Amino acid sequence: MKIAVVGAGKWGMALAHAYSQKNEVVISSRGKRDLPNFVSLQEALSCEYIVMAVPTQFVREFMSEHFKFNGQKILVAAKGVEVSSGKFLNSVYEDFLPRENVAFLSGPSFAAEVIKSLPTALVVSSHNKELAKSFAQAMPNFIKAYTDSDVVGAEVSGAYKNIIAIAAGVCDGLELGNNARAALISRGLVEMTRFGREFGAKRDTFISLGGAGDLFLTASSNLSRNYRVGYGLAKGKSLKTILQELGEVAEGVPTTSAVLQIAIKKDIYLPIAKEVGLLLEGKDPKSSLNDLLS
């Protein structure tokens, strides 16, 4: 099958590499025109199957400007919550096409390892079982792809784990040890589950690949951009400097703001997210972690 990958960041390119093992893949990006198999946005968005690797906060603007629905089927590869509306990413896409035409990709995965064809397990979630199966079966042999129908659980897990990863990065940057990081991640899983259950997510999703699996990976490795945000803050760098050094979006930063807005409206107890929000606003990292772990 022919698949268009829209968005040529590290994750978009990794997925293009993965899907190209068994399929015809074309790539489109507003900023990179010298890529192999590059096509215009118009051509990419007219393909039946599209992998969307556009950063969360730019999706609405991008879709409004470039997308016209004509039966396309989309696999959402980004993770996060839209700050302006408080909507999860699949809900944003559902403003532009039917939910039966949208699937969501989750699971413990770093672009740097997928691009090397290292063994990986992912989950494709959709309200449309056949759509999830189509995107999953098109994956290469080095990726074990599962399917699921709990889109909300996948979305919450994919977004929330980035918040916990920031906190874990601070923990390691302060050299508080493995015990402290394990406690923080475990409590983060409970907090993530509590948040997701408010939206009808299934509890089992949070102990699956897309939940605990992705959380443990993202919150324990410097390959994670969000982990590096927290680590940098612990080492005394400003958030602005850290984001400039990363050169790519760290979705946990805007997601923290969006989640806290939702928590206020729904009165949800989210102590780790609250502390991460204060950290991003300039609170001393040592004081913040002390408040969380004492």
Regions found by a protein language model. Give the residues of each.
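NAD(P)-dependent Rossmann-like dehydrogenase/reductase catalytic/cofactor-binding core
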Residues: 168, 197-207, 211, 215-294
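NAD(P)+-binding Rossmann beta1-loop-alpha1 motif at the extreme N-terminus of oxidoreductases
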Residues: 1-41, 45-49
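Glycine-rich beta-alpha junction loops
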Residues: 79-81, 106-110, 128, 149-152, ...
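A general structural signal for well-ordered alpha-helical segments in protein cores
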Residues: 12, 59, 86-90, 132, ...
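Glycine-rich, N-terminal phosphate-binding loop of Rossmann-like dinucleotide-binding domains
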Residues: 8, 53-55, 220
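Rossmann-like NAD(P)(H) cofactor-binding subdomain of soluble oxidoreductases
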Residues: 12-16, 39-118, 132-136
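Internal alpha-helical scaffold of NAD(P)-dependent oxidoreductase catalytic cores
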Residues: 47, 58, 65, 92-102, ...
